[in-house]
């Protein structure tokens, strides 16, 4: 089989600060009013009262959705979405295009390495640039799968289990239990600036959900980089009587010493997890060395599927789990091939967590959701990532080349 070359790469955006708000899609924080994901949730900005009540007040949704599409010479296309918006479009169309167009559709690792090295001088340790590279990488995997007629998970070597089981992230673990999920992860609402009173309030929330959900249902806390080591340690011990399964991303990404100390002082049996906002392979190696229990890369932010596979290998070599942060089909096709991912995350994007809404709604068509907390591998058998781009969304292409 002669594989075609890539003819063109194109980039669109929707939502964010320079378009309509509340668009959802790849930037799942960009939701409308009265959504749980924009409620009083602890963040690094919560210490400033002006930005404490709503996360959108400090700009969590300013980037918007990036859509990258790659077209082969035979007319077939692949695409992906992430969080990078209009600025990501500029990076794709004015810089990264030179490493993509003219390459064979199978040259994914070569393109990936060239993108990483060519952006070192302005990418730092991740962020917007890495989100953009991740989106390109995922689009390339989607195109390759469609050209050869295989789902991405088979390109990675095939499934190691028949189905993926999920926990749900949202404000209502009790509803998640009714839907068949194995656990529920809640956001914390208070931080170090609230003192011991904040610890008592979040511990009371866990206690309330433990009573509602029963003894065996997993409960976890997502702290979203909002704490310090002392506060996180005290919160972990305050929640230990309620069998909290893990405490997540308590500290900013680069505080490796803090994660090591937190793991050392956490209650016996309670896991410490992080990784959502780490953006390079090297940062995950260092994070792994802290001894945390689970690494949680976002495939749309960490460097794409190509990097996620490498992160999973680092974790496996140390006996750690890798449980990616959300990311829907882009995670599904990876984790069903990882032996050290026994479960995965489903992010509830319905406003009150009462219904099953696809994570990247409305930008993806045919995006699967768990049924009774599970997705069978047969659901993932369409070529590429198995989803289509909803071109009825208000997509803008601000740059060309």
Curated annotation (Swiss-Prot):
A GO molecular-function annotation: L-rhamnonate dehydratase activity
Active site feature: 325
Record-level GO BP terms: amino acid catabolic process; carbohydrate catabolic process
Record key words, sorted: Lyase, Magnesium, Metal-binding
Positions bearing the site annotation: Transition state stabilizer: 345
Positions marked as site (Increases basicity of active site His): 298
EC number(s) per entry: 4.2.1.90
Highest taxon, organism lineage: Bacteria
Disulfide bridge partners, by residue number: none
Binding site residues for substrate: 29, 55, 345
Pfam families associated with the record: MR_MLE_C, MR_MLE_N
Comment on bound cofactor: Binds 1 Mg(2+) ion per subunit.
Family the UniProt entry places it in: Belongs to the mandelate racemase/muconate lactonizing enzyme family. RhamD subfamily.
Subunit-level organization: Homooctamer; tetramer of dimers.
Biological role stated in the UniProt entry: Catalyzes the dehydration of L-rhamnonate to 2-keto-3-deoxy-L-rhamnonate (KDR).
Record-given protein name: L-rhamnonate dehydratase
Phylogenetic classification of the source organism: Bacteria, Pseudomonadati, Pseudomonadota, Gammaproteobacteria, Enterobacterales
Gene: rhmD
